[in-house]
């Protein structure tokens, strides 16, 4: 452009945008030239927003993420002038505010000294909108006092092609997916709302759920969900029912890019939504879905990995977590009977580790157990790395993870975190002794490491508050003595040697495991017991799992059972007595359980350690210093 020319804006452009929220070039109607000034430019997250001014009116405007580099490079500046080549005017937020979303533009002038102000027009004059289709310029209207226009040189008639003719020619030479893209411009996900009609989106499938069946008062059916991500990283959940679910389930593949149109939107149910979007999409059997070949610029699955030693605070909560780790072991497929409908579903447990030197058990369900689980079993000797998105955290066996309907697993992903993990495992992790996070939860929480000296409380702090742990598990550290281990309690249970679940005596001989669906000649014993502990403020009963109980008693449940049977009750009682009146550090969780319609507080030991008197003295000196301000 001529740098000496005085830049101007298009009068009435804001009013035109408000009246024409989504112009469509495929209709053959020329797109008007819209020149606006950038006012009050500022960043919001990864995008930039400003007020677009036509000299008289202003409208709140947002640039897509793909245009953000233009701002950072200085091409687009405050008080600059831009020509809008493609846009959507949408209603956003609870206030139903009109927002201009610019998807394509060119810079007319980087920055002026001041804001452009147009004088008030006479009432009879209408704003001039200059329409500029390619290779032609037509003035639809002009002010009455405007100077005469220069002569217009028309090209030979045979060379003139309408916009619709050009589009039709391009369609004929294009591949199906490209043809769909040319039919209408692609809309960003952020611009969609339930009141829009025709739109096309280009998105990547970043999560794909299982095809599930349901039964309600209206009958039976099937449903599945996908999570879709566009070039700006905006996400939306799409749901398909019955015939649409059967049609699109095999069509949608995780990680691929698609053009989608003829769907509908509604306000998302906040209780069930899985992505940050005010709306959710429904696709029926009339929706159009076509794969887009060779599209790599749309973001892949976005992870928010949590280290294994930082999983503790997520126990029992609704928040799902993403985990990346090295596969250590893979169990055979088990058949589990679901209590709700008595249906048998496949399950497989895998154990993964990361560079926090902790391991965690992850339960794979349904197709993930039989497909990906089998793949992992076949390659477990090579210690593959897996990235899993959307895992539920529970307190089963201390702490464990399990997949849900929308969980996704990528084996040996091409991620920086995977490269770092592989380097760690090959150099030192392979020979490192690792502990299960389920048996040692004193390790961490989000925001920093937690130790046996973090969240230290007296027993009275827990026992004096009957509502503690009512909403979700809370975690504390204790320094207490074991005052009693009742010898007549149920100290252990018979467990399957494969999965550690409870077994029953089989008819004839052996032991039956419902989880493994098999009969074994032998079983093992695993501790499940309670102990009474005391500190200067009181006493309480703590529940123990096998790993912590073995360290406290000093032998396995099988060994203690042998002592009782072969050496008699005196040796058995002596073994338990030797474990009492010894100080221990405990990391515990506090929850509420209901028994006989009465809520009771349950304190469970998550990890245990002997008292390090030097470390304990240092901790006490630090606490004293905090109190005295020294």
UniProtKB/Swiss-Prot annotation:
ZnF segments: C4-type:
496-516
Q: Which GO terms describe its biological process?
A: DNA replication; double-strand break repair via homologous recombination; meiotic cell cycle; nucleotide-excision repair; telomere maintenance via telomerase
Q: What UniProt keywords apply to this chain's record, in alphabetical order?
A: DNA damage, DNA recombination, DNA repair, DNA replication, DNA-binding, Metal-binding, Nucleus, Zinc, Zinc-finger
What Pfam family is a match for this entry? Rep_fac-A_C
* Ranges annotated as DNA-binding: 200-282
Q: Known InterPro entries for this protein?
A: Euk_RPA1_DBD_C, NA-bd_OB-fold, Rep_factor-A_C, Rep_factor-A_N, REPA_OB_2, Rfa1, RFA1B/D_OB_1st
Q: In which tissues is it expressed?
A: Expressed in root tips, roots, shoot apical meristem (SAM) and young leaves, and at lower levels in mature leaves, flag leaves and ears.
GO cellular component terms given for this protein: DNA replication factor A complex
* Keyword Zinc set for record: yes
Gene Ontology molecular function, alphabetical: damaged DNA binding; single-stranded telomeric DNA binding; zinc ion binding
Disulfide bridge partners, by residue number: none
Q: Does the keyword Signal apply?
A: no
Report the locations given in the UniProt record. Nucleus
Q: What induces it?
A: Repressed by sucrose starvation.
Q: What does this protein do?
A: Component of the replication protein A complex (RPA) required for DNA recombination, repair and replication. The activity of RPA is mediated by single-stranded DNA binding and protein interactions. Probably involved in repair of double-strand DNA breaks (DSBs) induced by genotoxic stresses.
Complex formation: Heterotrimer of RPA1, RPA2 and RPA3 (canonical replication protein A complex). Interacts with RPA2A.
Looking up PANTHER family in the UniProt record yields:
OS03G0429900 PROTEIN
Give the protein family.
Answer: Belongs to the replication factor A protein 1 family.
Q: What is this protein called?
A: Replication protein A 70 kDa DNA-binding subunit B
Encoding gene per record? RPA1B
């Amino acid at each position: 452009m001529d740098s000496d020319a005085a830049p101007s804006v298009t009068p009435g452009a804001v009013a035109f945008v408000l009246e024409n929220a989504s112009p469509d070039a495929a209709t053959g109607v020329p797109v008007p030239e819209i020149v606006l000034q950038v006012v009050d430019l500022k960043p919001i997250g990864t995008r930039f927003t400003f007020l677009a001014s036509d000299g008289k009116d202003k409208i709140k405007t947002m640039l897509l993420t793909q245009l953000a580099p233009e701002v950072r490079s200085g091409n687009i500046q405050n008080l600059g002038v831009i020509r809008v080549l493609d846009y959507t005017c949408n209603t956003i937020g609870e206030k139903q505010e009109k927002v201009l979303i610019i998807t394509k533009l060119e810079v007319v002038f980087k920055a002026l000294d001041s804001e452009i102000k147009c004088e008030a027009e006479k009432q009879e004059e209408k704003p001039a909108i200059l329409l500029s289709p390619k290779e032609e310029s037509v003035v639809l209207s002009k002010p009455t006092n405007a100077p005469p226009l220069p002569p217009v040189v028309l090209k030979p008639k045979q060379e003139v092609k309408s916009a619709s003719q050009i589009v039709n020619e391009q369609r004929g030479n294009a591949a199906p997916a490209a043809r769909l893209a040319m039919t209408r411009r692609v809309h960003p996900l952020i611009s969609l709302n339930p009141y829009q009609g025709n739109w096309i989106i280009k998105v990547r499938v970043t999560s794909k759920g299982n095809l599930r069946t349901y039964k309600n008062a209206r009958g039976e059916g099937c449903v599945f969900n996908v999570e879709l991500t566009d070039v700006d990283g905006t996400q939306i959940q799409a749901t398909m029912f019955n015939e649409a679910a059967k049609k699109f389930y095999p069509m949608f593949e995780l990680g691929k890019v698609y053009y989608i149109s003829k769907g509908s939107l509604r306000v998302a149910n906040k209780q069930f939504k899985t992505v940050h979007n005010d709306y959710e999409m429904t696709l029926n059997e009339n929706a159009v879905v076509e794969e887009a070949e060779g599209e790599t610029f749309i973001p892949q699955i976005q992870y928010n990995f949590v280290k294994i030693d930082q999983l503790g605070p997520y126990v029992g909560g609704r928040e799902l977590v993403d985990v990346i780790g090295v596969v250590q072991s893979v169990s055979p497929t088990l058949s589990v009977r679901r209590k709700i409908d008595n249906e048998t579903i496949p399950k497989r447990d895998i154990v993964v580790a990361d560079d926090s030197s902790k391991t965690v058990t992850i339960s794979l369900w349904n197709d993930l157990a039989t497909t990906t689980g089998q793949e992992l079993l076949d390659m477990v000797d090579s210690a593959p790395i897996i990235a899993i998105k959307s895992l539920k955290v529970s307190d089963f066996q201390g702490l464990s993870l399990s997949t849900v309907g929308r969980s996704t697993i990528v084996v040996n992903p091409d991620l920086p975190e995977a490269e770092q993990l592989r380097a760690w495992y090959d150099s030192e992790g392979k020979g490192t002794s690792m502990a299960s996070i389920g048996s040692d939860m004193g390790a961490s929480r989000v925001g920093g490491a937690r130790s046996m000296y973090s969240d230290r409380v007296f027993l009275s702090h827990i026992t004096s508050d009957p509502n503690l742990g009512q909403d979700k598990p809370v975690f504390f550290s204790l320094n207490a003595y074991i005052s009693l281990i009742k010898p007549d309690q149920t100290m252990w249970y018979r467990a399957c040697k494969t999965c550690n679940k409870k077994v029953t005596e089989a008819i004839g001989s052996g032991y039956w495991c419902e989880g493994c669906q098999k009969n074994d000649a032998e079983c093992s014993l695993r501790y499940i017991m309670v102990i009474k502990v005391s500190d200067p403020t009181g006493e309480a009963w703590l529940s123990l799992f096998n790993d912590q109980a073995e360290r406290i008693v000093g032998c396995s449940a099988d060994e203690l059972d042998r002592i009782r049977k072969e050496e008699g009750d005196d040796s058995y009682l002596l073994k338990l007595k030797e474990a009492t009146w010894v100080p221990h550090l405990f990391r515990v969780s506090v929850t509420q359980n209901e028994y006989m319609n009465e809520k009771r507080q349950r304190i469970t030991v998550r990890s245990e350690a002997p008292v390090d008197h030097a470390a304990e003295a240092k901790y006490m000196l630090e606490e004293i210093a905090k109190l005295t301000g020294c």
